[in-house]
Amino acid sequence: MNRRRKFLLASVLALQNSSFIYPSCQKCFSRIILVSKRSNCPKCGSTGESGNANYRYKLSLKVAESNKLFVITVFGSCLDTFFGLTATGLHRYIQDPNKIPETLDNDTTQNLLTKAVETCFVGQSFIFGVTNFENQPGQGSDASNFLQQCSDHKRKAKALVACQIVLPDPGIAGFTVIDYFHQLLQTFNFRKLQCDSQAPNNHLLALDHSNSDLSSIYTSDSTSDFFKSCSKDTFSKFWQPSLEFTCIVSQLTDNDDFSASEQSKAFGTLQQNRKSISIAEATGSSSCHDPIQDSWSLVSYMDKKSTAEKLGKELGLQAKELSAVHSSHHEIGVNDSNLFSLEMREPLESSNTKSFHSAVEIKNRSQHELPCFQHHGIDTPTSLQKRSACCPPSLLRLEETASSSQDGDPQIWDDLPFSESLNKFLAVLESEIAVTQADVSSRKHHVDNDIDKFHADHSRLSVTPQRTTGALHTPPIALRSSQVIVKANCSKDDFLFNCKGNLSPSVEKESQPDNKVEAVSVNHNGRDMSEYFLPNPYLSALSSSSKDLETIVTLKKTIRISPHRESDHSSLNNKYLNGCGEISVSEMNEKLTTLCYRKYNDVSDLCKLENKQYCRWSKNQDDSFTICRKLTYPLETLCNSPNRSTNTLKEMPWGHINNNVTQSYSIGYEGSYDASADLFDDIAKEMDIATEITKKSQDILLKWGTSLAESHPSESDFSLRSLSEDFIQPSQKLSLQSLSDSRHSRTCSPTPHFQSDSEYNFENSQDFVPCSQSTPISGFHQTRIHGINRAFKKPVFYSDLDGNYEKIRIFPENDKQQASPSCPKNIKTPSQKIRSPIVSGVSQPDVFNHYPFAECHETDSDEWVPPTTQKIFPSDMLGFQGIGLGKCLAAYHFPDQQELPRKKLKHIRQGTNKGLIKKKLKNMLAAVVTKKKTHKYNCKSSGWISKCPDIQVLAAPQLHPILGPDSCSEVKCCLPFSEKGPPSVCETRSAWSPELFS
């Protein structure tokens, strides 16, 4: 079978044979002859046992391709997929007595199998792989010519052979032949048990078979028996579309064989289901995601729309009837442009009391939908969502009566699901009936209790909200003993909250159009109200204690609360309150007062939790309070600094809040809150904290100076006088970091870092420049412990420290040579020291001759360099290295001078031969002047200062006392201070010479 194939897409019109399998040879696939127990192949001569014979499919179909007809015979195992089993398996299935009843003969079984094959193939399109197209007369190799030749000869159907059959769309799946055959067998067996030979009619199978035997079996009364015989699973499998064959349940309504009694029974079931849905809705089922509403709708869209319109008309008529008798009883009226209300009166009779459930509120939407909760989906197809949550059962019965005339309309069946979905849907409805009936009785009992309490109250508030452009409505609050009902009406989104039980209502916080001061202004005796609004925290506090109050108070955009003073015990007045419905005014006021007295702590908690809205109660007004909105400090700052003078709740006079929650307030009064004083009070607090930090810094410096004095017990005598005065005056500037840079030894403890005086002057000044919302520019975060904005004068003990440097002797054993305390003002700053050379060739005898000794290091405070993170000495920046005086003399290797060992340095310091030392120094200086243009200084051989850890660099011009006034050069000296003392090595003041680095 290796022939070439051509593919043909065609639709099956009819079957051409009734035998679909044949015994075939395993070698040549030809038909074999079965003789008794043996089989013989006439083509190839192979033989075998008849019991082991293989069977092969052979299906002959009449197909059409556009305007051409063909008879295609399909062979082979390619049909196994469509039959559901192999040809050999199908043969064994038919011959099995356990599968096929004994009452069915072979002919009947074959007829049922033929029906099953027709159901599976007829009307479907397939792609056939044709193999014998070359044997057609006049056929060429071109496929188009082949199709053209086949359509010749007066449109005669040409016989073709196909070895392949596939579906055009592999994704399409349908029932197989064996499935349909199994369904037909079950139906036929049921009729045999009922002693009636009946089978499904041709219409139900969508077939048109002309077999006389089948026609004699089938009757028109077989529909009901067929429905009864099939189980739910088999029924759904039978009616599921097979391939492209579709059967819709709605065809049952057009069937003449469908009896009138069964139609009335079906419609009765539908009406009962609709009533059960209405009852479930009337009982106020709280679940908005009921599976009933998520399933297929039992009402078409047109039916829903017309039903909603009729319901609106009926509700309007009912409203007129009820409003006609409400004159002697109180009423609840909620008026808004987005709602049309139905005013419900309190029934006079007990029979009418049972039917009273709640007020009817229907949204005026284009979809005519009744919303349940605000989270309900808008796209829900049904127009009667949770209608019973608002409607009394009597109105629902009116609506059902009005729409009952449409129940017999066959158009209702258009929206029904398929049978398998309908069965599940009806099962869900049946399971809901028991729960619904139990729920109805409990709901009615609950309604009776509510109406009894409603009778006891005899008073209601009817408030018409005032529409304000740009501002949302304040959520109304209903306070009740049994439940708390919060109804929020927004101009854009209308929604309904139901908070039941002891739960606190969820008051929606709405944004106000501005941040102005809010106040409560209420007048009594029905006079005009102020336009100030009660803040949301206060409303929350009132609603949180609703369990203690039985009166329903409805609050809208303009809060209308009757005043309550100690001298005035007027009630909550209502302009719409009827004369016969009033209760004692004193009782209501006492309840409100008790309510507010018990729950004032809740007000405090709510105000503390508000992020940027705090309450400030005026102390000079006994009958009023002002709501102030503070925008500057967040909640964190309020919690972290409880002592700050912000609008905390400790300033609220809770003593008279108990009696003045609803006190009257003058219309034009806006409170006496001074925001500027409050803001500057914060700055004063910050300055007090800054003063405390300054004192701490003074203590640190005192300890530091004491430790420094203790480190120089023999050479130093520090004076710590007037230390506190130095820190108070901020006029002079000093950086403690730079002081420790060159003055003090490494054993001293580090001092804290201070900010610059510019920042201090900004904070210390009283020139406060508020922003647009009167917020302070600097908060508490600018006052830091480690950096106070304050500059200090140079302490006196530092000058004393410099004086002690001069008192130290160069030669300890020689008491005659002491340093003079003169300190000139022309001392270089560290910036000048960096650029100054260590040795200068320019002599300045006229400047330094009158100085007997080195001068102390003192800098001008105005030229003081800010401190740095790293301490770098001028000698280190120039690349020089400090060496001792002995190494200084030995570094040059004078020809007439021997190297001075380090151990002889002590002898030089203590020697009394001044002339010898003077001569050596003169020779050294002469050599320096001679070689200054050629000698290059490096860190290893030409350093001047010793590497001793107790020596640091100081920039000051010095002349050795033993050199005399005739010296014309500059020298470097090593001062033999103690290890703990702060030594100093001075350098001369001279012009910078670039020749030293050439």
Swiss-Prot record:
Kindly state the tissue distribution recorded for this protein: Highly expressed in colorectal and lung cancer tissues.
Bias (Polar residues) ranges: 817-834
A single Gene Ontology biological process assigned to it is: apoptotic process
Keyword list, A-Z: Apoptosis, Cell cycle, Cytoplasm, Growth arrest, Nucleus
Q: Where in the cell is it found?
A: Cytoplasm; Nucleus
Keyword tRNA processing (UniProt): no
Would you name any one GO CC term?
A: nucleus
Q: Where is this region: Disordered?
A: 815-834
Where on the tree of life does the source sit, at the highest rank? Eukaryota
Signals that turn on the gene? Induced by UV irradiation. Expression starts to increase in early S phase and is steady high until late S phase in both cancer and normal cells.
Gene3D superfamilies, from UniProt? Nucleic acid-binding proteins (2.40.50.140)
One Pfam family, short name please? Rep_fac-A_C
Quote the PANTHER family the UniProt record gives. DNA DAMAGE-INDUCED APOPTOSIS SUPPRESSOR PROTEIN, DNA DAMAGE-INDUCIBLE APOPTOSIS SUPPRESSOR PROTEIN DDIAS
Q: What does this protein do?
A: May be an anti-apoptotic protein involved in DNA repair or cell survival.
Q: Which named protein is this? A: DNA damage-induced apoptosis suppressor protein
What species is this protein from?
Homo sapiens (Human)
The uppermost taxa in this organism's lineage are: Eukaryota, Metazoa, Chordata, Craniata, Vertebrata
